[in-house]
Amino acid sequence: TSSAASDVYKRQPLASGNITLLNALIFTSILLFLGSSLMLYFSNILTLLITTFGFIFYSLIYTIYLKWATPQNIVIGGLSGALPPLIGWTAVANEISLLPLTLVLIIFLWTPPHFWPLAIDRIDEYKKEGVPMMPIAKGVARTKIEMVIYAVLLFGASLAPFLYGLTGIFYLVSTSL
């Protein structure tokens, strides 16, 4: 199905035809090269590798394949959106440690209960587009149950930084509110 067929996508420059695929690829390549060069210059190779993984995972694996292949698309694809705390941490510390990984987990678990209400609200647009979002593939009732499950897991994961001794009482109180 053409992305231009849906209200969700028709205003995007590629779908509307305002930008050609070749021009988009050239512009993306320039930004990728410049951004990667700056990332490496101002931080380190570990940060560049994690950032590159996130870029490839989102732009190729999620956007081209997962989005169209599985109702778990935003769950799996949410990994790339959860990486910024790890990227920021490695830019400063040049190491991977438990605290930023718990933050990645928190954002990862936050994504489904955050996004699925939008998918429910726009279910007709996703149906028209042929995107197998959870509410379409498994039904709205099942999606709501999974949202609650993810919210419970999210609450538990939000306590992890305190329970592992990575943060103090202020974090625990603010997280529990």
Regions found by a protein language model. Name each.
Residues 1-5, 9:
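Single conserved hydrophobic/aromatic residue that forms the stacking wall/gate
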Residues 13-25, 61-80, 133-145:
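Interhelical loop and helix-boundary elements at the membrane-water interface
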Residues 18-25, 41, 45-48, 97-104, ...:
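Membrane-water interface of alpha-helical transmembrane segments
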Residues 26-70, 149-177:
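Transmembrane helix-loop-helix
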Residues 61-70, 86-93, 113-117:
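Juxtamembrane membrane-interface segments at transmembrane alpha-helix termini
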Residues 66-77, 94-100, 120-131:
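A cytosolic-side transmembrane-helix exit/cap motif
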Residues 86-96, 154-161:
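Hydrophobic alpha-helical transmembrane segments in multi-pass integral membrane proteins
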Residues 103-177:
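C-terminal membrane-associated helical module and adjoining short loops/tails
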